[in-house]
């Protein structure tokens, strides 16, 4: 920690986007955020927060979380598909599809939690800004913000008539279109806004099984919003968000068995069963109502009401081969209702703060069907005994027709499934305040208490016919899943608290320092597990994290450069990890991996060198590992292992060069570079011989824009991953539990052109 503090004291960086208002102005525009539930300049916020305006996102072509992550130190996004993201802040990942498990990183869309994994991926379009807060944020944001929060603030309807339309195309058959239109329905009182985004792109991996493609994209997002201002004291916003995702299948490619005529490299052709039937069909609908009312000059009442409904079906080939042995799907249904009431106090005096109540109700289910050809599965499981998996011509071996275990027939098709269910009802009470001790020193403190009722359920639907090759005696009559004989449920009540304490000191008019301590918490995990030959409720203790950090923020060079730096250290207790179950079923299980520690530092800068050149950069260092021993002094199973999806070093930088293109207009060139050091895809870094990892790599992107005079038109040409760098975004997966890990390739070189017309 001392070394990191020294580095902090020697560093100068930046944290906010810029804007230029004509060539005569060479300075950064003030950037206001609401990270602390009040409007304030980002340089005055004593939190490690990185925020970007919508204009910056558009300039760099950022339309998704995975595009955003490289420009936020401490943020790592793995997006296998819209149905299966992994969101990592400072080394801690949230990606569980179990509807009874809470997230570690919260995502909020206009103040409403959208954190549940299967419904959290949304397109980033027509945004006012995005704020990414690192460290425990439960006091400010509530559920799921154990180690960080992503806050999306969408553009609301405004008093005016304006719009724009964008259309473009690119390689891999890409077609895209987006647009916004804002209008006035009643002068000075009622306004409406509509925005949409559509992207369709073929997959970059060919599936030679039927000529279909994998790793593509097909997403439509639509948003409508109304704003009503009946008077100067009241503003009411009503927002409807809709998103439909129908991409082709994910390229889970086997690293063990090559496709016919190919190899096991993740970046080349795959041969997956079901062909074009693989893929995702996901629909997300969200309704949001926000009302703010100034009670008087001191108090403001805010109400945020949210409703979300989403369903997502994904069919995937878990073995990553032409073998018909591990054919899975996931059918997820989720519904949630939330309400927050908050009263804020601010007279521009020494004290300001807020207090409130919130309610959250959520229900979800994840149904997982499993299909297999028992003849092929038997050959695969007996391969160590000399049974060939494939025939000499490369076709799967279906010669085993009688089970060596049961003596019964082995069938060409058998199906079984399980369903996990979860329900949460929670009530929060919270308070947070800031007191200016002097003109230079301010102290902040916050507290949130949560009362929650959690229900977890599990049910197995037995095989169509008794399994010919059960993988364990307890599983019969099924192949993989031990029967439950109906739905098994358990309910528990929990009470908890989180808090923060912060001190901010204004060193000068341009520089301030802060120090904070905060407590984060992930609720107890309630599982239905198979123990001792029967299903029983199993509780894993709540995860607790204590986070400590110090930071500096400021501006320099006459407000031409913004910079920020922070050093952090956190201590985890009862850190939960996913591991292969030594006594299945199930194949994998959630375990208490004990204690863990993380430390690091984060740096950002952004500035304007002159009217023609602007620049930005970020750097992050994260050392997050499992401790050697637990609280009892016993050596931990994962001692010394690095958290999954955690690069020790990440950085990004770029610049925008602007200039006149004669009388025709202006041109802009924006090159950018992003780098991630080596990271693992499993908390057990040695799993599968340590091959479940990605070495350090960098991606170079470039954008060129032409703006004719009048600023109505803009044409942009772009290339992402200019040098066509090969890298993987995940490894292991379900196939890894059977000793045949699969690998997913990242995007290759993508390029295209888009044109925008503003009116």
Regions found by a protein language model. Give the residues of each.
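Conserved C-terminal beta-signal and adjacent last beta-strands/turns
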Residues: 6, 20, 332-358, 515, ...
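Acidic, small-polar-rich N-terminal luminal/periplasmic segments of exported/outer-membrane proteins
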Residues: 26-160, 550
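Outer-membrane beta-barrel translocator/receptor signature
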Residues: 102-104, 116, 125-134, 139-208, ...
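Solvent-exposed loop segments that connect transmembrane elements
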Residues: 205-213, 250-273, 317-327, 369-419, ...
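Outer-membrane beta-barrel domain signature, strongest for Gram-negative TonB-dependent receptors
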Residues: 211, 217-354, 360-366, 562-563
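Structural signature of Gram-negative outer-membrane beta-barrels, strongest in the C-terminal barrel
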Residues: 227-231, 344-346, 358-360, 422-570, ...
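Membrane-embedded beta-barrel scaffold of Gram-negative outer-membrane proteins
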Residues: 286, 290-294, 298-316, 506-522, ...
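Gram-negative outer-membrane beta-barrel transporters
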Residues: 354, 436-443, 564-571, 591-683, ...
């Amino acid at each position: 920690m001392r070394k990191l503090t020294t580095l902090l004291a020697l560093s100068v960086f930046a944290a906010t986007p810029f804007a230029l208002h004509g060539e005569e102005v060479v300075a950064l525009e003030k950037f206001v955020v609401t990270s602390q539930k009040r409007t304030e300049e980002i340089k005055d916020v004593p939190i490690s927060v990185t925020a970007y305006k919508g204009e910056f996102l558009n300039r760099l072509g950022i339309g998704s979380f995975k595009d955003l992550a490289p420009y936020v130190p401490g943020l790592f996004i793995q997006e296998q598909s819209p149905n299966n993201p992994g969101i990592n802040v400072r080394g801690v990942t949230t990606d569980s599809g179990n509807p009874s498990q809470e997230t570690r990183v919260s995502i909020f869309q206009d103040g409403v939690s959208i954190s549940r994994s299967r419904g959290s991926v949304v397109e980033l379009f027509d945004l006012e800004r995005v704020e990414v807060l690192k460290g425990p944020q439960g006091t400010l944001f509530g559920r799921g913000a154990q180690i960080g929060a992503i806050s999306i603030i969408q553009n609301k309807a405004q008093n005016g008539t304006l719009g724009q339309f964008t259309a473009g195309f690119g390689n891999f058959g890409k077609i895209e279109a987006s647009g916004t239109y804002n209008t006035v329905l009643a002068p000075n009182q009622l306004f409406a806004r509509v925005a949409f985004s559509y992207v369709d792109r073929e997959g970059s991996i060919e599936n030679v099984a039927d000529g279909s493609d994998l790793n593509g994209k097909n997403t439509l997002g639509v948003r409508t919003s109304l704003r009503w201002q009946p008077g100067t004291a009241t503003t009411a916003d009503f927002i409807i968000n809709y998103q439909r995702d129908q991409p082709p299948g994910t390229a889970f490619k086997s690293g063990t068995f090559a496709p016919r005529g190919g190899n096991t490299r993740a970046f080349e052709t795959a041969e997956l069963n079901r062909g074009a039937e693989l893929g995702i069909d996901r629909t997300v609908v969200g309704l949001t109502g926000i009302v703010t009312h100034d009670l008087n000059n001191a108090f403001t009442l805010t109400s945020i009401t949210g409703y979300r409904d989403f369903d997502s079906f994904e069919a995937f080939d878990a073995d990553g081969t032409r073998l018909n042995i591990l054919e899975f799907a996931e059918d997820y249904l989720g519904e949630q209702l939330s309400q927050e009431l908050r009263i804020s106090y601010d007279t521009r005096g020494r004290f300001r703060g807020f207090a409130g109540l919130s309610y959250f109700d959520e229900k979800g289910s994840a149904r997982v069907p499993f299909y297999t050809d028992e003849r092929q599965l038997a050959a695969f499981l007996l391969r160590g005994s000399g049974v060939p998996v494939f025939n000499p011509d490369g076709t799967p071996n279906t010669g085993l027709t009688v089970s060596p275990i049961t003596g019964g027939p082995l069938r060409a098709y058998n199906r079984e499934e399980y369903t996990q269910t979860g329900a949460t009802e929670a009530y929060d009470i919270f308070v947070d305040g800031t007191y200016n001790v002097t003109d230079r020193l301010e102290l902040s403190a916050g507290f949130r208490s949560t009362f929650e009722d959690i229900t977890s359920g599990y049910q197995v639907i037995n095989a169509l016919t008794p399994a010919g090759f059960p993988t364990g005696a307890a599983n019969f009559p099924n192949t993989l899943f031990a029967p439950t004989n109906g739905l098994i449920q358990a309910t528990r009540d929990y009470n908890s608290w989180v808090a923060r304490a912060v001190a901010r000191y204004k060193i000068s008019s341009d520089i301030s320092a802060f120090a904070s301590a905060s407590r984060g918490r992930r609720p107890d995990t309630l599982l239905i597990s198979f123990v001792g030959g029967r299903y029983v409720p199993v509780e894993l203790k709540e995860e607790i994290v204590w986070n400590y950090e110090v930071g500096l923020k400021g501006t320099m060079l006459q407000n031409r450069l913004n910079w920020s730096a922070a050093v952090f250290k956190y201590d985890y207790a009862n850190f939960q990890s996913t591991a292969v179950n030594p006594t299945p079923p199930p194949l994998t299980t959630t375990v208490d991996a004990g204690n863990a520690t993380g430390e690091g530092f984060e740096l950002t800068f952004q500035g304007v060198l002159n009217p023609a050149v602007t620049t930005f950069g970020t750097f992050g260092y994260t050392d997050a590992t499992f401790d050697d021993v637990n609280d009892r002094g016993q050596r931990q199973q994962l001692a010394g292992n690095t958290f999954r999806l955690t690069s020790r070093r990440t950085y990004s930088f770029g610049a925008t060069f602007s200039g006149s293109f004669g009388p025709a207009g202006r041109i802009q060139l924006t090159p950018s570079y992003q780098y991630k050091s080596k990271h693992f895809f499993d908390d057990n870094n040695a799993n599968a011989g340590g091959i479940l990892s990605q070495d350090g790599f960098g991606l170079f992107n470039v954008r060129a824009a032409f703006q004719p005079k009048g600023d109505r038109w803009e044409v942009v040409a772009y290339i992402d991953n200019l040098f066509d760098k090969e890298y993987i975004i995940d490894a292991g997966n379900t196939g890894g539990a059977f000793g045949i890990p699969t690998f997913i390739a990242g995007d290759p070189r993508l390029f295209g052109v888009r044109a925008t017309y503003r009116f």
